[in-house]
Amino acid sequence: MVRHTAGHLVALNWTMKNVFNVDPGDVFWAASDVGWVVGHSYICYGPLLHGNTTVVFEGKPIGTPDAGTFWRVIEEHKVHSFFTAPTAFRAGQRADPKGEVAEKNDTSLLEQASQAGARAG
């Protein structure tokens, strides 16, 4: 795969503000695999280019060890915006259908949750 560096970097910087709604200094988390293009683009390059702290997470965010992993990471690292696949949201809903686990964490700083990569329905 060949990436034209300048255009790719300009697009990543633009999407950090205009898609993920983060300002320099905000904490951003892309719960993706760094081996995928979206992973290294939004775990590494985009946030660092835009002046954001990025959360690097190892493991599955749902089911390991429990459905609260997503929300604990968001609370612990004061995540402002995060991005994941619809599959992760669905797994969270199956594991915690009433949102009881999610409510145990302070996610008041989380302003945006985005999803892409598979159909949401």
Regions found by a protein language model. Give the residues of each.
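Active-site beta-alpha turn of Rossmann-fold NAD(P)-dependent dehydrogenases/reductases
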Residues: 32
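RNase H-like, metal-dependent nuclease domains and their acidic two-metal-ion catalytic environment used
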Residues: 36
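Conserved adenylate-forming
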Residues: 24-25, 50-53, 58-121
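Conserved short alpha-helical elements in the N-terminal third of ANL/AMP-binding
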Residues: 39-55
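Glycine-rich helix-loop-beta junction characteristic of Rossmann-like nucleotide cofactor-binding loops
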Residues: 18-22
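Conserved AMP-binding A3 loop
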Residues: 1-10
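Short, well-ordered alpha-helical scaffold segments within catalytic/effector domains
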Residues: 9-13, 41, 67, 89-90
